[in-house]
Amino acid sequence: MKYALRGITAEELSYTMNRIKMDKDTKFEIKPQFSRTVRRVQENDKLWFLALEVKVESTDDSPKPFNVKARLVGVFEAEDVNDDVDKQDLVINMTEIVYPYLRAAVSALTANSFINPLILPVIPAGTMFPEDRGEAPSNLN
């Protein structure tokens, strides 16, 4: 299997400050929520799109000083993707390629909002999503 990144686009980048009352020494638990969508172009079966998204949202139960949402889309060209194992490997590899760009976008977005930058953790390839770890059936087209 051969694949190559052809481009990355920021489909959505948003930051919203939440004006919440807090003590000076309050610590917030920031738990980013990740999601991923994979599409294959039917007219050109070599073309793949991977959308990787992260959200940090304030709730009544878990208030946060801000909301962040970032979604990047990577465009890939891939050949010799012959079976489900190849597809799963390709999806994991595409995720591994796009994720550092997502980390950088979130850090820049929060830093440019004049707060301490949110730095997403380094996550090893194949462990970000349950289906990559074999914990749930994958639904890839």
Indicate residue ranges for each PLM-predicted region.
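N-terminal intrinsically disordered, cationic/polar leader segments
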Residues: M1-I97, A104-N141
